[in-house]
């Protein structure tokens, strides 16, 4: 498929994650362990956006008593390989996506050939037993491959994300724009001074961008480039001058300048997400094998330490002004941004040489992208499931007070549910046939984590899972699969922030909640 045809096909999603995000998705390879309904729904929502390839690993045969809700199983496929049946139908959604299937138990594959997973960009798993799950997680983390483990039973669903770390330059928060109103650079100051705003007629004044108006007033208020403009006298004088302009020219740009004047009195400060990255040990003490993100973060810290500012993005907001004035101002901001990129590039190349690495290892495009998006950088660390499952290691659970609105009982119910199945096999009726045994396992589990006082509310959730008899409801699995796919795309494209780290859905009351466990 040609580039233009591809962009037309994926037009809507490219608007969300742009061409670079789409390219990352198209290069990705996704593996699904166990082709149950929720797993197939997750894959469906990844195949449609155009992942590069997918693999289904499953040794079970189609059983309509359990697979009847799966839209990717046909009525004449009873007893056939579930991996082959689902993989072939899933591929029909997007023939450009390559497909493979493996008729083998995921647990056996993890035990005998765990290296198989090294070729994937992300692994999706459901219904894995605890021991192979932990082993797979450890292997994937060592290869920097995200793992998404999930389940859907009856009216409830759960998702857990595990990855060694998540770094992005496109976290997409609602950050204030970096316009440097309080700290204009010489070229911007000279441009503002070149215009005689005080002697302009109202028509000419109405064409001036509010940025120019604000800096002009600041320079009048405080000749030292508004360095003392936090003082009450300066603020009062600023408001007085703005009122004079309003009286002279009652236009929208003057109103914009007044409504945005607070930005002129705000001290330059690192956003919390940037501060966390620049003070992270991985940034401060980079190593020869440090990833590109941390090398550039280290260089960003050097840039900030020297200039007391981050590189300028060069982006301007929409403003009420003439096109000619807007373009002139845009050129000044763009030139400043380009100069900051060149300065940042020097730091990157010097650092790479110091680490005995090639200066070509980080491309000019990567440097430019990082520099212009540095306000959006973010790092997230994820606790391992193995750590989470240790009875004494989870401070979130230990300090929890479960109220009527909390979905923590559902999380605990899923943990106990999996424990019972692991002890008594995957025959649901057999595993939950003895109520006394179920109660005993639940009490023991809650006692280990100090939450035995919440037995009643947790046991109610367990009974709801039992009532499903191991079956999935398509509407619930479709929803959970959509969430899994959404979070997977974030991880693949390295855009936006994935949930950290557990998502729980209660379909009975249509409620969701996330926990950092």
From Swiss-Prot:
Signal peptide: none annotated. GO terms for cellular component: cytoplasm; cytosol; nucleus. Keywords: ATP-binding, Cytoplasm, Nucleotide-binding, Nucleus, Ubl conjugation pathway. Pathway: Protein modification; protein neddylation. It is found in: Cytoplasm; Nucleus. GO terms for molecular function: ATP binding; ATP hydrolysis activity; NEDD8 activating enzyme activity. It comes from the Eukaryota. The keyword Acetylation does not apply. One of its GO terms (biological process) is protein neddylation. InterPro entries: APP-BP1, ThiF/MoeB/HesA, ThiF_NAD_FAD-bd, Ubiquitin-activating_enz. Heterodimer of uba3 and ula1. The complex binds NEDD8/ubl1 and ubc12. Regulatory subunit of the dimeric uba3-ula1 E1 enzyme. E1 activates NEDD8/ubl1 by first adenylating its C-terminal glycine residue with ATP, thereafter linking this residue to the side chain of the catalytic cysteine, yielding a NEDD8-UBA3 thioester and free AMP. E1 finally transfers NEDD8 to the catalytic cysteine of ubc12. Belongs to the ubiquitin-activating E1 family. ULA1 subfamily. This is NEDD8-activating enzyme E1 regulatory subunit. It comes from Schizosaccharomyces pombe (strain 972 / ATCC 24843) (Fission yeast). The gene is uba5.
